[in-house]
Amino acid sequence: MNPVQDKPTLFVVHCIDTEGPLSESLEATFERLENSLDIRLKPGRETLRRIQSGELNLGDKTEGARAVCAPHNLEYNDSWPKVDSMLDEMLSLEYRQRFPDSEGHGCIFNWFAMDHVGFDENPRLRDVGYLNIFDHYREKMQETGANGDELHFHLHPASTYRQGHISATSYLRSPHLLEGLARRIVDRTWFPSCFRAGFYTERPDSHWFLEQWFPFDFSNNATSESATESMQQDIGGGRFGDWRRAPDDWSHYHPSHDDYQIPGNCRRTIFRALTVGTRMRLLKQSDVDAAFARASAGKPTALGFSDHDFRDMRKDVEAVYSMVRRSAEKFPNVRWVHSGARDAARRVLDLSLIHI
């Protein structure tokens, strides 16, 4: 028996919003800047460089603009060959073993795959169609023998005007949600157990829908809002991804019927997952320390973090596991393990595995 198995355990869950390739033109970047911060500038490479460096004085919005236009955020995998080039390395045993957990096991990835359907305009050149992304990753996992990885479900509701680059929140007005799930059952003999909300956004209609179908929800990204985040109109004040009232101590919870953000008597369990490699609600060293401290106190804990496959995730993986290693040194009594989302939920909740 490995002696570390007698220690308190922290389950580290890498959640990937799996959306396939994404392209964004220079003009679209400046349009997004205007929508987020109400900054209207003539698109240009030199202007973008000055925003990124902070040379362009935009008053109290300077840092917000730098966050929206950060170089890493704009380095998109804009084709399947680029995505696959990244995956070929990340899914290899050699790469996984660069980040061993307390038991020496390599990292595990959780692919929350979505369908790009329900829109007529596709300026970001998404791979449109049911099961396209699901099938691509399922085949890739089989090719590489990624037996520890898990495949799950991710959804972005359709915009009212059927524009693929516009974020929306209404599940009631997104019939492709039901068809996407039905196709997974009928065409692939598969149904998800874990879910992540697009743009981290839930509201009453999605809350009650999820309650009927998904036992495990990894959408909570509650954290204190920074000044840079609060000035961004699309995310500030809970506009998208409102988890301001939700637990931010890495505790999991059954939500209330009337408010998905507070503990109650609903059946599904919501877990926390903070973001990396983006412009909001970022995982910090203090967050990782808090997860280790909770586990050290004997409380079953899952530390979730999330990013997107349309960016180079290797930088994110390196950054997160550097933080994990530092925390592990502070809490030597804690055994930390890479985990699938479903497996972590089962273990944290002490659920028995039932074969049907």
Task: Describe each region flagged by the PLM.
Residues L91-P100, Y137-T144, R173-I185, D287-R294, ...:
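Structured alpha-helical segments in the cores of large, soluble enzyme domains
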Residues E19-L22, H116-E121, T160, T278-L283, ...:
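Short acidic, S/G/P-rich loop/turn micro-motifs used as interaction or catalytic elements
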Residues K284-A319, M323:
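Long, repeat-rich segments with strong aromatic
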Residues I354-I356:
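Conserved small/polar residues in nucleotide/adenosyl-binding loops
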